[in-house]
């Protein structure tokens, strides 16, 4: 875990209630796939945990949903603002277990961690397939970014407005894959778990300190 001050480079709306914040700072080396950061926000006692969407030297990308007063305040932050950030939180994914054709599944707020994971797997010569699950067309985000990686990207919407009608498990049918990584709401993860032989799963959850000291 590291503590550093980052500067906002951009903070833009992607979909209703979904924003992408790009930060500039030095402590990005430990922002590996599946890990998260915590941001100290003005006038709020508890830091806000946000999963890492992308990270490279000197730049950190976070994609977040406005689910309360803290994230609603974040959505109003402008370029140039400086934020105190704790990086390197969480265990992250074990990429060595992926095999050649890993399957990456993200549902709603669980989509962002799959992006950095996909990039790192591709860099290792792997050929991931990505399934992104949403309720309806207007909620879709980051589809173009995944497709730009040159990998198979499947969209599933509960109402059938785009892609496969139904849930991510419906989109899994008939796919060949060696291992599974998934992030999203608990009902989705339970359904995926019941459909695969082996995998790693990240839960969306509220938390206090972010590193276990508060036992929350």
Where on the chain are the PLM-derived regions?
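Ferredoxin-reductase
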Residues: 2-81
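FNR/FR-type flavoprotein reductase catalytic core
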Residues: 69-206
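Short cysteine clusters
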Residues: 209, 214
């Amino acid at each position: 875990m590291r503590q550093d001050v980052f500067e906002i480079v951009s903070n833009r709306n992607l979909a209703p209630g979904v924003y992408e914040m790009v930060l500039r700072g030095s402590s990005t080396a430990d922002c590996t796939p599946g890990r998260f950061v915590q941001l100290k926000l003005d006038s709020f006692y508890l830091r806000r945990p946000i999963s890492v969407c992308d990270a490279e030297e000197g730049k950190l990308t976070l994609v977040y949903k406005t689910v309360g007063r803290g994230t609603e305040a974040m959505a109003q932050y402008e370029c140039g603002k400086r934020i105190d950030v704790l990086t390197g939180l969480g265990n992250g994914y074990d990429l060595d277990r992926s095999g050649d054709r890993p399957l990456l599944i993200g549902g709603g707020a669980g989509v962002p961690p799959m992006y950095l994971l996909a990039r790192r797997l591709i860099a290792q010569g792997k050929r991931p397939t990505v399934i992104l699950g949403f309720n309806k067309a207007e909620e879709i985000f980051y589809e173009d970014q995944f497709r730009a990686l040159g990998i198979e990207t499947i969209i599933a919407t509960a109402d059938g407005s785009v892609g496969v009608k139904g849930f991510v498990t419906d989109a899994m049918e008939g796919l060949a894959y060696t291992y599974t990584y998934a992030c999203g709401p608990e009902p989705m993860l339970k359904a995926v778990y019941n459909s695969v032989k082996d995998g790693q799963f990240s839960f969306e959850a509220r938390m206090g300190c972010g590193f276990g000291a508060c036992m929350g």
